[in-house]
Amino acid sequence: MLIDSHCHLEYKGLIEDRDGVLARARTAGVGGFLSISTRQREWGQVIATAERESDVWASVGIHPHEADAHADLGEAALLAATEHPRVVAIGETGLDYYYDHSDRETQKALFRKHIAVARATGLPLIVHTREAEDDTAAILAEEMEQGAYPALIHCFTASAQFAGKVLDLGLTISISGIVTFKNAKELQSIATTIPENRLLVETDAPFLAPVPHRGRVCEPAFVADTARFLAGLRGVSAEALAESTTRNFRLLFSKARL
């Protein structure tokens, strides 16, 4: 069994046929889905889906692109949302300097609020970082000194140096379908070095469909393609990688129950 540790089931491309999307994924061997929110208005939607589907769980958080629109969001709102039994994670949150859709200082402040809630609740923090390695690593380290919290880097595309820094902090790394891309040689190399007990797989659906589905809307079913490719890189069987990543998910997201 595989678990898609990061997908957006409420996004265009999936929501129109969500029942079919989930059915196809289950047929492909996917037994769990973490449905990620990126705006406060999505929280109710992801929670409602998780209430209906026993193998779907929800996250609550604000994507860095949306930081300016949520600059006044307090920790209390996040804390209240985490009380729902189907909410198992905080995020996605973090820093994105590639698009700079939100002020960088606002992104940083909101990122720290999410970390505080992850620390207070013990729920894993789902971190997005793009073109912001130094600041992301610095904030993660500074906040870890204030008290430990569980966290993962989702859709990892950063450097080997950054991977080393976050692994030293105790974080988990999640690999998406990007690893299957022909030009992803550096990521493929890094993916072979991640410790077995710190590795997850994801789709980030409806984005980033892996080979052989490039150009299509990505679905959670495609996590099986990413897992097979990743297993080949790491020199293990697809079954062994599915077993280890599912075990890692259950340990990290301990509130998620099947």
Language model feature labels by segment:
Residues 1-258:
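Mid-domain alpha/beta scaffold segments of enzyme catalytic cores
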